[in-house]
Regions:
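Fe(II)/2-oxoglutarate oxygenase catalytic core
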Residues: 1-150
Length: 150
């Protein structure tokens, strides 16, 4: 069985990666503490992170960088799995994005799955069929993402 995980190295240039990190660090008033579950609870024993939520419909250069990388990758993914365009009902990429930072010692410490999305989200996250991530660092010694069933 295929694992359905699509990996694409260097999907964002180093210059654009630096822009995204600079944006994150320069906007502390937009920082949120990482929450868990569709009820968005703070549970430090489960997750500790800093996050910013973005909506690509509020056009700025940062959103354009991420949206372009993500939508191009989705198109490549659909070529590998063409049933996504023919065997399922109409679907779309949600315009809400989350940028997360985990400092050393922080993380999402429990197994979890993508769930109902963010509060007030117009597209129901409960109907989510795919999730995507872009990593902006090379940290491998003390951080990782595990997909236990893949």
């Amino acid at each position: 069985m295929r694992d359905f995980i699509f990996r694409k190295k260097n999907v964002v240039s180093q210059e654009d990666c630096d822009k995204i990190i600079d944006f994150f660090e320069s906007n502390p008033n937009s920082h949120l503490q990482g929450t868990v579950g569709s009820e968005e609870k703070l549970v430090p024993s489960d997750k500790i992170s800093t996050e910013i939520l973005l909506n690509v419909t509020h056009c700025n250069s940062l959103n354009e960088i991420i949206w372009k990388a993500m939508t191009q990758s989705v198109e490549e993914y659909k070529k590998i799995f063409p049933f996504l365009d023919s065997g399922v009902r109409r679907w779309e990429v949600n315009t809400i994005m989350k940028i997360q930072r985990y400092k050393p010692g922080e993380g999402y410490f429990v197994e979890h799955c993508e769930n109902a999305g963010f509060s007030g989200e117009s597209v129901g996250g409960d109907k989510r069929m795919m999730a995507w991530m872009i990593y902006f660092n090379e940290e491998r010694d003390s951080g990782y993402t595990e997909f236990p069933t893949q």
